[in-house]
Amino acid sequence: MSTKNKKAAGGNGGAPKQTRQQSHDSQDYSSFKTVLFYCMLIVFLPVLTFFVLKGFVLDQFLNISEVKVNIASAVGAVVALHIALGLYIYRAYFGAPGSKGSKTD
């Protein structure tokens, strides 16, 4: 059998290559899910924090002017944004357990 026929027949070298590709695909998908989660957290957490603080917490329970309510809600949103960014940076710097990549040639 010629070399050309062995490759077409799916010789023994195809299985490790396929599992390696699946491993890379699963790592890429896991990375994508992580980045997507943190992007959504960074975008939506401050907005949600602003409106929750403004609409439910500060307006309902505290008797302060609307300008002060807006300022306090904005400060809360900025704090929430910094927390989300800090979580992302912590995860990016220290990584998830078992995420150490190994070099393969």
Swiss-Prot record:
UniProt topological domain (Lumenal) ranges: 58-68
Pfam family, one: VMA21
Ranges annotated as spanning the membrane: 37-57, 69-89
Region (Disordered): 1-26
Chain coiled-coil ranges: none
The entry's keywords: Cytoplasmic vesicle, Endoplasmic reticulum, Membrane, Transmembrane, Transmembrane helix
Signal peptide, first to last residue: none
Subcellular location: Endoplasmic reticulum membrane; Endoplasmic reticulum-Golgi intermediate compartment membrane; Cytoplasmic vesicle, COPII-coated vesicle membrane
Xref: InterPro entries: Vma21
Membrane topology: Multi-pass membrane protein
Family: Belongs to the VMA21 family.
HAMAP family: VMA21
Record's protein name: Vacuolar ATPase assembly integral membrane protein VMA21 homolog
Natural source organism: Drosophila sechellia
